[in-house]
Amino acid sequence: MFFLLSLQIDIKTESNMGAFHAYDIRGVWGKDWDLDTAYKVGYFIPALLKADKVLVGRDCRVSSDEIHDAVVKGITDAGADVYDIGLSSTPMVYFGTANYGFDASVQITASHNPAEYNGMKVSTTDAQAVGYDAGLGQVKAWIDEGRPTPVSAVRGQVYRKEILADYLAFMRKFVKDLGDLTVAMDLSNGMANLFAKEIFGTDDNIHYLFDTLDGRFPNHEPNPLIEKNCYPLEEKVREVKADVGVIYDGDADRVMFVDEQGRFISPDLMIALMGRYFVGERGLKGKVLQDIRSSKAVGEYLTPMGCEMQTWKVGRAFAAKKLREIDGVWGGELAGHYYFRDFFYSDSGLLASIIILNIVAALKREGKKLSEAVAGIVRYENSGEINYRVEDKQGAMDAVKAHFTAQETPSAFMDFDGYRVEFPDWWFNIRPSNTEPYLRFLCEATTRERLQEKIAEVDSLLSERFGAKR
């Protein structure tokens, strides 16, 4: 079966390119980018990735259907075929790309951003990310220079492809006996609704929140990193006396967790906790990836288990590639992305949640609580990321580095994503936002007093010299 789309698009020479970023294409729909951009990105993907077949999925946002139609028309006008999987989570597209051997794929989504946003995540062979440096920058250049988009003499066709059953079968292999585990699960009105009940069931001990697809996200923004968005889940955990709370973002590539007391758990600590599954249950003592913001406690917990830690840049375009390069077993980021060798070195909110629920169920059988297991990992006081609005980001970063390295000699230094500078009793990371005039600062110390002292120094320095505001 195939069908052809009929879509009228006004092709322009100039296009609003404000949506091209380091990891993907994303911005306010109709303001930062439009149908013209969507069409042209679709048109240039086959040439960029040398693909004659492109897998395409989309999330449930209100604008996703029209973007989908524009992207598909661009791909087929360029002469490539489209395999349309319809509504999908982003990891479903990764699965489809790698499992069925596609050389290119597009997921239409703005992930965790508010409803007025939309975007595209592009992947190539084996679900490898195509970020700005790996090809999206070339697409932008072609659009900027007005490269022609003539319709191919032989237009591509559009085929419907069903992958959900295969995806669920793949994921069910990782589910162990969850026993009488009580779980509260916030689906954020997003794409986790496609699979959560199929995987975790609908028994009375699984309590779902916002379990309908609604691209307006009427209950909260689909971003679990914003504290208030987790309040309903935290309340539900306490109400039903759940053993764990789970919350997905809009496209279900990220997931975060709440303990049985309704307290948010920092995602980097869950990288460490996963050692109970990968090392404790499966005996996999290989390399583990963490981002440059991760607590020192993660490595201090996993290294004695026989794991080798690898620290790297923030963002899927970097993390998934690095995990593949080092043949790592698993990894994660402070933003709630978790990457797995078992999942084509890509991130999956579903697989991460399955693994954590397996761990919590095992803890419960041992008479232990999730909060107790996390307490065995935490060793430091941590600021979390603090955003400073500043125009001269590089100058401000250099000033912070110079200020502290003049006081004492670092015990470790990294400069591949901003700066991470470590001292005997504290460390900090300062890095620029890729999309906004912000510096992101995070520090960790052995005591609360030391932590507050260093934050105060940064506040003062950035305010006085750069006019920075939080």
Q: Predicted regions: what is each one?
A:
Residues 53-59, 182-184, 286-292:
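Short glycine-rich phosphate-binding loop at a beta-alpha junction
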